[in-house]
Amino acid sequence: MAPVRTASLLCGLLALLTLCPEGNPQTVLTDDEIEEFLEGFLSELETQSPPREDDVEVQPLPEPTQRPRKSKAGGKQRADVEVPPEKNKDKEKKGKKDKGPKATKPLEGSTRPTKKPKEKPPKATKKPKEKPPKATKKPKEKPPKATKKPKEKPPKATKRPSAGKKFSTVAPLETLDRLLPSPSNPSAQELPQKRDTPFPNAWQGQGEETQVEAKQPRPEPEEETEMPTLDYNDQIEKEDYEDFEYIRRQKQPRPTPSRRRLWPERPEEKTEEPEERKEVEPPLKPLLPPDYGDSYVIPNYDDLDYYFPHPPPQKPDVGQEVDEEKEEMKKPKKEGSSPKEDTEDKWTVEKNKDHKGPRKGEELEEEWAPVEKIKCPPIGMESHRIEDNQIRASSMLRHGLGAQRGRLNMQAGANEDDYYDGAWCAEDESQTQWIEVDTRRTTRFTGVITQGRDSSIHDDFVTTFFVGFSNDSQTWVMYTNGYEEMTFYGNVDKDTPVLSELPEPVVARFIRIYPLTWNGSLCMRLEVLGCPVTPVYSYYAQNEVVTTDSLDFRHHSYKDMRQLMKAVNEECPTITRTYSLGKSSRGLKIYAMEISDNPGDHELGEPEFRYTAGIHGNEVLGRELLLLLMQYLCQEYRDGNPRVRNLVQDTRIHLVPSLNPDGYEVAAQMGSEFGNWALGLWTEEGFDIFEDFPDLNSVLWAAEEKKWVPYRVPNNNLPIPERYLSPDATVSTEVRAIISWMEKNPFVLGANLNGGERLVSYPYDMARTPSQEQLLAEALAAARGEDDDGVSEAQETPDHAIFRWLAISFASAHLTMTEPYRGGCQAQDYTSGMGIVNGAKWNPRSGTFNDFSYLHTNCLELSVYLGCDKFPHESELPREWENNKEALLTFMEQVHRGIKGVVTDEQGIPIANATISVSGINHGVKTASGGDYWRILNPGEYRVTAHAEGYTSSAKICNVDYDIGATQCNFILARSNWKRIREILAMNGNRPILRVDPSRPMTPQQRRMQQRRLQYRLRMREQMRLRRLNSTAGPATSPTPALMPPPSPTPAITLRPWEVLPTTTAGWEESETETYTEVVTEFETEYGTDLEVEEIEEEEEEEEEEMDTGLTFPLTTVETYTVNFGDF
């Protein structure tokens, strides 16, 4: 019976084939006709049970049973790809359940011979089709799979040519499939299930699964003609060998395969496959897919993600995103094909054209690249924007080591055991200790900077710590690394700041540091990095400053500074000029900017003002403020700001942003928060510029003790000691350049900008040792319970009141300097809330810039300390500019307060180096080369005196008003004979000249000595006259200095008592108008040869001794005559 049945089945199949021509399969039979035909066969086979045995006999082929299973795993993922004949068997199952497609399958069977030859090229195309779905998930898998599958396809193609055999096997398989659903009668319900799920296993028996899988796929392969997919594990192993950078993307949700089945895409990819096959095949030749056998149950990999996360499944909801993903998936496949590279981004193709594999990896890296870390500025621990009451701690070792001392770069006082030490230190090290900062607003914290204790004795610092956050200071959340509290590593020494960044920012209001381990005692200083999240509310609205000036708010290197000054000069060429003071020890130029209506020239009556900064290289705020001031003055002058225009037109302003460029370059390498207190402070040679000037205080005070001032030692413009002028003197290169610059320009007022404190310091900076009288007076005052200011007065300058006025003018205009609640930056507030302090009382030191400027020149110099943070963050520059802008302008305007004028003689010729002194102030000023002077004075009435050598002094009363604007006080001096008198005294060795009384009788010896003395004086007068004539005749021809002419070889001329040596020439002496008379007594006795000067002096001494004896000599007659000398 079995042969009869098989024969009947074959006949039925042949009948179906004849009814379905190859060209038009769908036009011959409809779905209803096919169903009726199949139901007829099923009805015949329902009562027969041996078909299962036949099935077992027909099923000896193991490959079709295994491959359909593999196709199940890969079918969902490779819905777009044409599957080889084995895989088509699985799709036949799908078709059979979809009764309509069954008709198409047999029709396609007729086309098998035509499709089989075509399957070889599609094999290459099939591989790319498998790639796109995987590419959608992870494009890296596409190329490797394409290379692996081509190897399996050629052998499968050889099996296909036997079309007859396949027809013979397909017929019994189809009949068996029809027999199985009939007993249960769920065919109508189960067929749609097969459509949704291409791998039905639940409703079939264990033996039937293999049979159905082997039988059903054979009519369907002609429909889809897709290659079978390899085992998923085999594919992964092969991909690992091919390219380690490819990311596996095998999992996909079950509904996606239906969406991916884009049939029109197959022909497009087929043409591209051969090229890819050639490129990828060589590395895959030695690789063979592992065989797991029929019993191996393939797990469901659709829900698993290997090694890498895959974001694409999150995007399929949006249609546009899915389309973009598809386009991106196609790009990696089309790398090898030149015609389709045009669709890709030109820049990416050009960048990665030589590296196809890495290029895909780079695309994925861009997708998964972490967001750039937010860089936040300090919240203000070091700059004291965080107030003391915003910092708390679990405990403190003593009052001087409280939480408020835990600021970054906090400096200890001179006595480390006082109330101002250099860190926060905990009391009990056994308990959990912490220090907390309240930002008073929601803040995004990004890091913490820690530092050890500032001490010359102790070596204390924290090595590891935890970090916690809170919004209410009650509930704290520790920062973790995902599974435990994250440990941050701190310092390895006590001075170097160390940054500990948070891997991910945390938004909170409070932050705590929990030290874990430490060296020495538990002490630390810190700064917190954070960005405000919430807007500024009422509390900060009073303190926040927003600038409206369009300036360059950033830190400038040496090159940037030079470029900025050049840009300002080009923008305002009529009022600016850039020049150099000299060079540093490393050869960097010290640049200066002059701002005036006539740059480059000193105008008569126009005062000169200077701002200097960067004396210490790590004190950067002053440097940036002067660069901002340059830009501001230029912009406002061009915009017509009347205040700035008046200042520029009436003042010659000099701005030097960096006096120590070498030190700045050292400090800038570490940045604003990571340089310690002293890094970059000194020059390259190791000098502190501020304290490297000649010590003139000691010279002046020693002269005052000897009562030599102002007769032998002046009280102003003291000369520099010789030991500082020698080439071997230990003076820095920068100081030499600064002194030369100060002597060339007649500065009136100046200030040097520093950092580390918030105050204004004025001279003296050197502490003067009190005298015995002052110490005694202080002791008596203390015994009586009174305050004696004798010692404090010893530290004050004669212009103490004027210095205080100038200091207050800057501090009062500063927005934060005079706020008493802020206190001192490092220790107690020495200013008592006024923002000004005497340098000797605050920080005594010798040889400072301020003292030297006051004693050696006419310039009143002050030191301005701009803030607690020497090197503020770039984000704080706008705020600091607004805090200091008004103060900088106000202080410059003070140069026009006091008196000014010009000193000339009666002919209107200016007198240089004339001294202007004010009664009550034991310090004068000198006139400039043009005879003009400026004297800063407080409002009031003053008696001013002008005197110069060779001129008669002149005095007048000058009034100074409160308004800005100096009072004009000019002086005209008349010539005096003091110059000639000094010359005569010099001729006599600066000894008193003896005058002989004519009525007194003289001995012959006295008369002889008198004659010799007179002759000697006449000869010296002639030599002086000849010397002056030589000096005024013109420059000497020889480079050697002119020597004194030797005595005249002509014989001495004997003069009668009434004769006078006639003048040989009438030159410049005739222009002199003043004369004086000298009474000379001449004896009638004649003398022969002249005596030497030594002999005359010896005889004069003998004569004095004889006169002391009181002996009487014979009387002789004498004559008296007058000699008139021109005043030279």
From Swiss-Prot:
Glycosylation-annotated residues: N519
Coiled-coil boundaries: none
GO BP: proteolysis; regulation of collagen fibril organization; regulation of DNA-templated transcription
UniProt-annotated stretches for the region Required for transcriptional repression: 932-1128
Disruption phenotype: Two independent knockout mice have been generated for the gene encoding this protein, and these exhibit different phenotypes. Mice lacking exons 7-12 exhibit reduced growth rate and body weight and resistance to dietary-induced obesity. Individual adipocytes from these animals are hypoproliferative while the adipose tissue is prone to apoptosis. Mice lacking exons 7-16 die perinatally from gastroschisis, in which abdominal viscera are extruded through the ventral body wall. Surviving mice exhibit deficient wound healing, having dermal fibroblasts with reduced proliferative capacity.
Sequence ranges assigned to domain F5/8 type C in this UniProt record: 374-531
Induction profile: By TGF-beta. Expression is also induced by a high fat diet.
Biased composition (Basic and acidic residues): 77-101, 262-282, 327-362
CDD domains: FA58C (cd00057), Peptidase_M14NE-CP-C_like (cd11308)
Chain segments carrying region Required for DNA-binding and interaction with NFKBIA: 381-546
Pfam annotation, one family: Peptidase_M14
Basic residues compositional bias, start-end: 113-163, 249-261
Interaction with MAPK1 and MAPK3: region residues: 412-615, 997-1128
Gene Ontology CC, one term: extracellular space
Similarity field: Belongs to the peptidase M14 family.
Subunit structure, as described in the record: Isoform 1: Interacts with different types of collagen, including collagens I, III, and V. Isoform 2: Interacts with GNG5, NFKBIA, MAPK1, MAPK3 and PTEN. Interaction with MAPK1 may stimulate DNA-binding. May interact with calmodulin. Binds to DNA in vitro.
Protein's recorded name: Adipocyte enhancer-binding protein 1
Annotated organism of origin: Mus musculus (Mouse)
Organism placement in taxonomy: Eukaryota, Metazoa, Chordata, Craniata, Vertebrata
